[in-house]
Amino acid sequence: MTVRTRFAPSPTGFLHVGGVRTALFSWLYAKHHNGQFILRIEDTDRERSTQESVQAILDGMAWLGLNFDEGPYYQTERYARYQQVAQQLLKEGKAYRCQCSKERLEALREAQLAAKEKPRYDGHCRNQTLPDSGVPYVIRFRNPDAGIVSFHDEVYGDIHVDNSELDDLILVRSDGHPTYNFAVVIDDWDMKITHVIRGDDHINNTPRQINLFKALDAPVPVFAHLPMILGEDGKRLSKRHGAVSVLQFKELGVLPHALLNYLVRLGWSHGDQEIFSVQEMITSFDLKNVSRGVSSFNYDKLYWLNQHYQKSDSPESVANALQWHFEQAGIDLNQGPDLKDLVAVQAERCKSLAEMCQISQYFYTDTIEYNEDAVKKHLRPVVLEPLMVLHERLKALDEWKNDKIQECINDVSLQFDLNLGKIAQPLRVAVTGSGTSPSIDMTLALLGKNKSIKRLEDALEKIRARASAV
């Protein structure tokens, strides 16, 4: 048997982390078993489905590297197939037309609630022969009257539901459009899906869908339902907790494999291992180690993983991802150091690519923004003479290299009997605008001689102006 899994999002909003984890688990299960992963867009909600959301799903999957073997298939392109199966079920007596009005159904619901009964359709049209006479109708499934629906969920174990608890669900609405539970069964059947991995909000749909599979003499897939992801406050993850859309994490500067590594550990474990390459995920993944408990999304843990990959990945690969952030900020990368050289000195100083971009822009701009507190603290008249001497020493350098730069700084600090920090920190503020940067020799080396000298000259003017104002 060839394992075939699917990811079937509805394009009614962004691709959120819960959906991404479902996609990841489905993708990993298929890859682990040398199977196939199918993408299906469940776009039957015509009012809420948008092409923009479809594109966000495709872009998010591409960014994460969750490539699909087939698809994307669109439910709206399969309406003829749903009608064909509905007519087949009608012909076989496994479905029936229902002409109950909205008013009757609402009155039925209110009466059942008043009697403290579970609201459900009472089968009013079940045994009537209603011709297609032009009166609006829905098509309902003739659910078995008796017996028990039993299935083994790969996460939750054995589940049993009495058919008496299930009413006759609607398959096709009066406007001819299929319902979710009907379309998804036909799709999984036609697409030969062997394993349905999805959120546990669908677990109540499963007995109904199993009955439909059996009515169609279709093979019933294996089901695995994943517990939901909560925020750290124990509430369902939402926008108030921060980023929840996969492409928002790209904007925040999270590397795609860092997000995958984090998500795979939300509800799944492989011993005590925390760090997984994508290949290690594929090799190790199984469903038996998926937890039944809910997971909490912890941003600190995600950024810890992200920083790990920033430091352990090759500077070239991190630079490729970082480039997008500089482009979004409108920074001309031709005006500064090679990005891979920047990554080599900044990766361990930042938790994200967005932060790396933000604190590194002074390497690529002609002008810098000064932190006024840093200026007041370090660009004081007392350092004017040492910085003037350092300026001349640096300007005279033939080789603009780390060791030569550091040698100049050391010599000037000795000449004026200053602690190294007393000269390095004013120099740092002079060339970066702030009191934090990589090592001062590396900072100047990456900036280049011309920028470093020009900024030091600008800082000397600031100090002279400050001295004359005293």
Swiss-Prot record:
GO terms for biological process: glutamyl-tRNA aminoacylation. Keywords: Aminoacyl-tRNA synthetase, ATP-binding, Cytoplasm, Ligase, Nucleotide-binding, Protein biosynthesis. GO terms for cellular component: cytosol. It holds the Pfam family tRNA-synt_1c. Its main location: cytoplasm. It catalyses: tRNA(Glu) + L-glutamate + ATP = L-glutamyl-tRNA(Glu) + AMP + diphosphate. A motif ('KMSKS' region) lies at residues 236-240. ATP binds at K239. Gene3D superfamilies: 1.10.10.350, HUPs. A motif ('HIGH' region) lies at residues 9-19. One of its GO terms (molecular function) is zinc ion binding. PANTHER family: GLUTAMATE--TRNA LIGASE, GLUTAMATE--TRNA LIGASE, MITOCHONDRIAL-RELATED. Belongs to the class-I aminoacyl-tRNA synthetase family. Glutamate--tRNA ligase type 1 subfamily. This is Glutamate--tRNA ligase.
